[in-house]
Amino acid sequence: MINVNEFKPGITFEDEGNIYVVLTAQHSKQGRGQANVKAKVKNLRTGSTTLKSYTGGDKVQKAHIEKKPMDYLYNDGSNIILMDQESFEQIEIDVKKVEWELNFLTEGMKILVRQYQNEILDIEIPINIELKVINAPDAVKGNTTTNPQKKVIVETGYELEVPMFIKEGETIIVSSETGKYGGKSSK
């Protein structure tokens, strides 16, 4: 059992028959009242994100999740195809479970598959991902307000805002947690 006061990002638990991973946890105490914990959690079975509230001191069942290293091969439209790095066995995961992660997956990427009692839940990808910019408009002269940004499209089709100096063909670092620009790659 896990005390909800110990919630922090990455903790997996079972609640009402579902498996969740904590994305963010906010602890608050009201005057003489009891402490509350609000946690933004992801349901690992459905892929949906929700906000759960608990009273301080509540306990939930810990979910022991196995993480298996795999390679991302391709997306066939309804499933992503992954290959086990040891047995070369291929598995499929419904794209609905990994909608956010699809924005960052590139062929051959090393990822972790989360399993609970032999049930494949979803995937875990690196936090910082290097992606090539395939479409970037030129910087417009005179467009220099504080911290000017422009929208670019990376090789996976994901669109994000980056500083004006980023050019087409450059490799940038993107955070898979926030989807935001994290810096220029050294590649």
From Swiss-Prot:
This protein's record includes keyword tRNA processing: no
Subcellular localization(s) per the UniProt record: Cytoplasm
Name of this protein: Elongation factor P
Lineage, highest ranks first: Bacteria, Bacillati, Mycoplasmatota, Mycoplasmoidales, Metamycoplasmataceae
Taxonomic superkingdom: Bacteria
Presence of the UniProt keyword Protein biosynthesis in the record: yes
Assigned keywords, A-Z: Cytoplasm, Elongation factor, Protein biosynthesis
Protein family according to the UniProt entry: Belongs to the elongation factor P family.
Reported function: Involved in peptide bond synthesis. Stimulates efficient translation and peptide-bond synthesis on native or reconstituted 70S ribosomes in vitro. Probably functions indirectly by altering the affinity of the ribosome for aminoacyl-tRNA, thus increasing their reactivity as acceptors for peptidyl transferase.
NCBIfam families given in the database record: efp, PRK00529.1
Signal sequence segment: none
Gene Ontology MF annotations: translation elongation factor activity
Originating species: Mycoplasmopsis pulmonis (strain UAB CTIP)
